[in-house]
Amino acid sequence: MKTKPSIGLMVVMLMFPQIVETIYSPALGDIAQSFSVTYTQAAQTLSIYFTAFAIGVVVWGLLADKWGRRPTMLVGLLVYGLSALVAMQTDRFDVVMLARALSAFGIAVGSVVTQTMLRDSFSGEELGKVFGVMGIGISVSPVIGMLLGGQLTALGGYQTVFFTLFVMALGLFVYNVFKLPETQIQKQPLNMGSLLGRMLRDAQIWQSTLLVALYNIALFSYYQLGAFTFEALGFSSSEFGYSGVVLGLGTFVGSLLNKFLLGKGRTQTSLLWIASILLLAGGFGVFWAQTSIWFLVPMLLVVMAFGIAIPNVLSAALVDYKQQAGSAGAVFGLMYYLLIGAGLGLAGIIQNLGVVQISCAVTVSLVTMSRMKK
């Protein structure tokens, strides 16, 4: 008999990686000033974060199949908490970068193991609906992160942010010790070479990988570049934090719209097409309006597109790999997080939010059209 985890706990664990990333974004300006580095160097910590996150997804995904879901989750949370503690105490920028990489490696467990546990416990239409609920949770996580990050940065700078992250990780670790069940029924023999070859030859996997990566780059490039855009427009880090409320509302509306349309029987293909159109409109709007605070209005369309697209892509991506859910999730996660890291690295160099948004939107449209031709 399957032991199903609490949906509430799963929502929190899937939200946590996004919360801890966006809570850090308002502190980028403070980090640049405190360590006397450029904004471009400070922004690159986000690219490093996602690259290390990709490695973590692979390691924790493989360990989830080998050790089990529960112990893997606990070890990952422990690694994250200790890394946040190191980042809080150092006075060297290179150590901050290393601690950020290790923290990303650790918290990747919240993404890959949570998704694996959901795929263990649910299937078919039920799994799609559960991921819809997850999407609603994910939609509010940037709001929480940005608001907390803005206030904490104003209160005590980046060190207060990292201390808060440590406390949050410790609290989740203790809660999971008592409440997280094991969902793996039996361990499956793993032929990693065979699995990797199969996935790399699967066009559906590549399409899903590109869509997840591009929608995330569109979203997180705002958290990467937005703090500097706000400063250039004369706004503070706390005011940048408040902007997360606006964008979180957009993602929340997108997630609710996704849930409503799924309930009305709309197909995944039609929902992805709607998301693609919203992203195109939002991307061009951001490009045209980015010299004023009104660029937040088209950014709403971008985050709405994210809220619609991501639950649909994630729920369907690994339907043919259920017997090796952890390892397949690890490979899938590695693929899209490496692309996210590379994309945000380019975004940090370009330092133009509008150009990044248009590039993501056009590419998403092409991938969506190729997916519809199947």
Locate each region found by the language model:
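Helix-breaking motifs and short loop linkers at transmembrane-helix boundaries and internal kinks
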Residues: S36, G68, Q89-V95, G106, ...
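C-terminal membrane-cytosol helix-exit motif in multi-pass small-molecule transporters
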Residues: F166-I185
